[in-house]
Amino acid sequence: MTLLQKEYNDVAYISGPLLFVNAASDLAYGAIVNIKDASGRSRGGQVISVTDQNAVIQVFEETRGLDLATASVSLVEDVARLGVSKEMIGRRFDGLGRPIDGLPQVVAEQRLSINGQAMNPAARAKPEEFIQTGISTIDVQTSLIRGQKLPIFSGSGLPHNELAAQIARQAKVPGHEGDFAVVFAAMGLTQREVSFFTQEFERTGALARSVLFLNKADDPAVERLLTPRMALTTAEYLAFEHGYHVLVILTDLTNYCEALREIGGAREEIPGRRGFPGYMYTDLASLYERAGVVEGKPGSVTQVPILSMPDDDITHPIPDLTGYITEGQIVVDRTLNSKGVFPPINPLPSLSRLQGNGIGKGKTRADHKNISDQLFAAYANGLDLRKLVAITGEDALTETDKLYLRFADDFEQYFIGQGDQDRSIDDSLTVAWGILSKLPQSQLTRISKDAIDKYYGTKMDEMWKGSRSLG
């Protein structure tokens, strides 16, 4: 401690991970502090509330061993900051930005506040460039657009971790492969999940263009609140200082929100819906709204937050509030997963509100929008007929109805259930045509005659042309 550094010794009480310090109203909200006990051991902490009477500090480690009479607090930094550098690409960090890959600390080019800076709405450019994830259901029916924030709604026990890893290794902006990067932040991981992501990124070579932030379930709750902000600060730096197109994958936001609730409970705040704090909407918006494209800047930040819906309830506050802020959703389906379909993405409740901006002639392919609409209509019809067959049997169906039933089966098996293949958008559209061509031309009411003349009749053996397995 320097001679000019002030210490705060009047610790009023300790509640769980929180310290309440009297006469510390001059500490700033968000400041990083150092907490010492009688033995001289130091712990980090962050100021999460300041009033005229006291300051509330969230301790980054356990509070065991801290004594009210001997504990002291001193200021380290006015706000939580992260040292950022282009050399972070290819590295693994914990939730606080400390290296966990056995390599030295990154030499920082800048130290930036993890809260970021508000993006001027007038400076935002319209997102209109297609990002290819290599997953047919996403690319064709719920297209991800550069600068968009498109969440994935999953559930407990569903393979959203595998889906996240697949998107991370396959995603690219066609024509910009050299300046595309992935920032991956995972919160509340078990040790098995940490091993899975570490091995998967290394095995597939995805780590070479990625920055990983891995927060474990046994880490302090406050670290889960800092992890996505560390990731987004890194993404903004790579995008707007070095011109990268950055895809940020955040998983699992449910763990983040539960940490928010845990800290709110320790602070004895009045709870909102289902015990979550009333400011959760604002807090989530402070994360999601950091995605975008800025006029005059070469890079961009695109977000794919992943959250597991408790009890598969899409009206739960976490997915509900997320839906208000973001631009659509991709829904992982338990029924498809039980059939062994991977990735089990159900296109019917899924939606990309910006899809129309980034697909079509000159962007993907002229027939893209028509194919997407026709797949939605035909699959919905096939599912309705499945329900009818469960009641009346197939004898009551027409020949066309039976073709729709077969279409629904083929759609799930070949289009949705692609496994670990990395498909280009042309591959995915070829698969779609191969399945749609089993329906009579008269049923393809959402596709132009020119497209039907050009593509109708695609054979099943052509469906896999250009596809490759990464298994």
Curated annotation (Swiss-Prot):
Which BP terms in the Gene Ontology apply to this protein?
proton motive force-driven plasma membrane ATP synthesis
Q: So where does this one cross the membrane? A: none
Q: Which InterPro entries match?
A: ATP-synt_VA_C, ATPase_a/bsu_AS, ATPase_F1/V1/A1_a/bsu_N, ATPase_F1/V1/A1_a/bsu_nucl-bd, P-loop_NTPase, V-ATPase_su_B/beta
Instruction: Name the Gene Ontology molecular function terms of this record.
Output: ATP binding; proton-transporting ATP synthase activity, rotational mechanism
What are the annotated disulfide bridges?
A: none
- The stretch of residues making up the signal peptide is none
Give the Gene3D superfamilies listed for this entry.
Answer: 3.40.50.12240
Q: Which Pfam families match?
A: ATP-synt_ab, ATP-synt_ab_N, ATP-synt_VA_C
State the UniProt keywords alphabetically: ATP synthesis, Hydrogen ion transport, Ion transport, Transport
Q: Family per UniProt?
A: Belongs to the ATPase alpha/beta chains family.
Quote the function comment for this protein.
Produces ATP from ADP in the presence of a proton gradient across the membrane. The V-type beta chain is a regulatory subunit.
Concerning HAMAP family, the annotation shows: ATP_synth_B_arch (MF_00310)
What protein name applies here?
Answer: V-type ATP synthase beta chain
- Biological classification of the source: Bacteria, Thermotogati, Deinococcota, Deinococci, Deinococcales
Q: Which gene encodes it?
A: atpB
